[in-house]
Design a protein with these regions (language model features):
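Basic nucleic-acid-binding interfaces
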Residues: 2-38, 50-75
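Active-site beta-strand termini and strand-to-loop segments that position acidic
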Residues: 44-48
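Major-groove recognition helix of helix-turn-helix-like DNA-binding domains
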Residues: 40-42
């Protein structure tokens, strides 16, 4: 597995090539915990109640989700 720092760098450089597992790994590292799965989306929540959904059905997630994650982790 790649380190979280490498994944975040990849998210900044190439936001359209991030897998759902990589996104989940980054969210876990920054304090988000897997909450539930509903349909084709996984839901992560942090201790402040901030929620981030990540689609799991496609091999890569759309850039809009990557931008949301980067914004929420402060990058």
């Amino acid at each position: 597995m790649a380190s979280v720092k490498k994944i975040v760098d990849k998210m900044k450089r190439q936001p359209n090539g991030i897998s759902p597992d990589e996104a989940g790994q980054v969210l876990d590292h920054y304090g988000y915990k897997f909450d539930r799965q509903s349909g084709s989306h996984k839901t992560y929540i942090n201790k402040n109640g901030d929620v981030q959904t990540v689609p799991k059905k496609r091999p890569t997630i759309k850039p809009v989700y990557v931008k949301q994650i980067l914004s929420k982790i402060g990058e």
